[in-house]
Regions:
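Internal, hydrophobic beta-strand segments that form the core of beta-sheet-rich folds
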Residues: 53-58, 95-101, 108-127
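Extended serine/threonine-enriched, polar tracts that run as long, contiguous segments within proteins
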Residues: 153-222
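A eukaryote-biased signal for short, well-structured alpha-helical docking elements
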Residues: 1-12
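A beta-strand/beta-hairpin structural motif
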Residues: 66-108, 128
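Short aromatic-acidic-glycine turn motif
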Residues: 55-68, 216-222
């Protein structure tokens, strides 16, 4: 869907702008392509700059609770320096590179409830107007998809996803926010953790995988959080045994046997080396859990996302029907623009 607006800063008779993104979803660190379509007004106008701004709906925690707001996390100048004649139609194609930490919004075409938008700013004769917004769809990188599919195969279920304002200490995070994907524990770990939160922090060479467990308390001990971090390469993803790798990560997280020495293996208790993934000790609060033998296979995370949590209708993600995400983008950012005005 394309959101089309008349340039308010120029009033009636000014040029109009549509930004149309190419239909295929983009990927973190990948190329976003499309066209900015301009329609001339009732006079000639000097188009100084055409700027695209990537904006996300982000949650922030503070003393008063939680609030949501729009955070712009990248800007690109894609055109300008020309005269748009009266009534002229012109297309300005663009190709820009997304930040590596751009959140993913879907898995196998199923929305995760993350709201990202591309907002167009036109600078005309000294006036600027943020005139057009389009929904941005981002699919996972191969390594991200492999981790999610492995978690689904191990019996973990999708609960929700959101963007949190702030930084994760000890990581190479660059954006002012990070994505949290909340997972329901598999039956094997249901007695030990309430949920597991997953964060991907991608970079040109690979990505950091941050796992946090909300661990259940015992009869005499309170519950607490445990955190571990692992590094994964973009190379050789298709040659790895991801269920075994991820199961090793979960074992370290739940048992809290993270090693603070040099990276060894991919994080499993056996410590087998792998060029595509290696475990790295993270931070957490020490508490030994109980390891249960056995392995549960099941549908991949794509199926789990499509089905949603047990008892919820198919397609309901984070309290919002996936098909309504487009409207949510428009409503949310229009509200932000009214506040800015």
């Amino acid at each position: 869907m394309v959101f089309k607006r008349l340039l308010g800063a120029l009033g009636v008779g000014g040029p109009t702008v549509d930004t149309v993104l190419d239909p295929a979803p983009a990927r973190p660190g990948g190329t976003l392509t499309g066209q900015v379509r301009l329609q001339g007004g009732n006079a000639d106008f000097e188009i100084e700059h055409i700027t695209l701004e990537l904006v996300a709906r982000v949650e922030a925690e503070h003393e008063g609770g939680e609030s949501e707001g729009a955070v712009a996390f990248e800007r690109f100048t894609v055109g300008g320096g020309f005269r748009l004649a009266e009534g002229e139609q012109r297309e300005v194609p663009f190709s820009v590179t997304l930040p590596w930490e751009t959140p993913i919004t879907e898995l196998h075409g199923q929305g995760l409830g993350i709201v990202l938008g591309v907002r167009t700013e036109l600078s005309v004769a000294g006036a600027k107007d943020k005139g057009d917004l389009d929904q941005l769809n981002v699919a996972p990188l191969p390594a991200q998809e492999a981790v999610l599919e492995a978690l689904g195969g191990l019996g973990f279920g999708f609960r929700s996803a959101d963007l949190e304002y702030g930084r994760i200490g000890g990581t190479g995070q660059r954006l002012p926010f990070y994505q949290e994907i909340e997972l329901l524990p598999s039956p094997r770990y249901a007695q030990q953790v309430n949920e597991i939160e997953l964060t991907f922090l991608a970079n040109p060479g690979g990505m950091e995988v941050v796992l946090e467990a909300d661990k259940r308390g015992g009869f005499l001990s309170p519950g607490h959080d445990a955190l571990t971090r692992f590094n994964v390469s973009h190379e050789g993803v298709e040659h790895q045994d991801w269920p075994a790798i991820v199961e090793g990560w979960i074992g370290q997280l739940v048992e809290h046997r993270a090693s603070y020495g040099p990276p060894a293996g991919y994080g499993s208790p056996m410590g087998h080396g792998s060029p595509a993934a290696f475990g790295q000790g993270g931070h957490g609060h020490g508490h030994d859990g109980h390891h249960h033998d056995g392995h549960r296979s099941g549908p991949g995370m794509g199926t789990a996302v499509a089905a949603g949590a047990a008892g919820l209708a198919v397609g309901v993600v984070g309290g919002m029907v996936a098909g309504e995400v487009v409207d949510e983008v428009g409503d949310f950012f229009e509200g932000e623009e009214e506040e800015e005005g």
